[in-house]
UniProtKB/Swiss-Prot annotation:
One of 8 partially redundant surface-active proteins required for efficient formation of aerial mycelium; the short chaplins assemble into a hydrophobic, amyloidal fibrillar surface layer that envelopes and protects aerial hyphae and spores, presumably anchored to the long chaplins. Chaplins have an overlapping function with the surface-active SapB peptide; chaplins are essential on minimal medium while on rich medium both chaplins and SapB are required for efficient aerial hyphae formation. Chaplins are also involved in cell attachment to a hydrophobic surface. The gene is chpG. This is Chaplin-G. Disruption phenotype: A strain deleted of chpF and chpG makes rodlets. Deletion of all 8 chaplin genes on minimal medium leads to severely disrupted aerial hyphae that collapse on the colony surface and are not hydrophobic. A few spore chains can still be made, but they have neither rodlets or amyloid-like fibers. rdlA and rdlB mRNA are down-regulated. Deletion of all 8 chaplin genes on rich medium leads to a reduced abundance of aerial hyphae without rodlets and occasional spore chains on surface hyphae. Residues 38-78 form the Chaplin domain. Its main location: other. It comes from Streptomyces coelicolor (strain ATCC BAA-471 / A3(2) / M145). Disulfide bonds join 58-76.
């Protein structure tokens, strides 16, 4: 087998392995765990902390907490969607 065919096979196999592990993670925004039946305050084993990470979607870039912002200088807005027109352009 030639080197190019081996390299293509390895690249295809690696891509298949990487893409097979991707998926969507979904979670609730609030933490509502409970240690039911535990005899004391410190005897439960439930620790939950709600985490809120701001994600900025601007044009065709996505930033998490604005680190190394590729959209520097673009006008973007983070806010509620108050316009309920339901369509594009007005």
């Amino acid at each position: 087998m030639s080197r190019i065919a081996k390299a293509a096979g390895v690249a295809l196999g690696t891509g298949a392995v990487v893409l097979s592990g991707t998926g969507m993670a979904m979670a609730d925004a609030g933490a509502a765990g409970a240690a039911v039946g535990s005899p004391g305050v410190l005897s439960g084993n439930v620790v939950q902390v709600p985490v809120h990470v701001p994600v900025n979607l601007c044009g065709n870039t996505i930033d998490v907490i604005g680190l190394l912002n590729p959209a520097f200088g673009n006008a973007c807005e983070n806010g509620d969607d108050d316009d309920k027109s339901g369509g594009y352009g007005g």
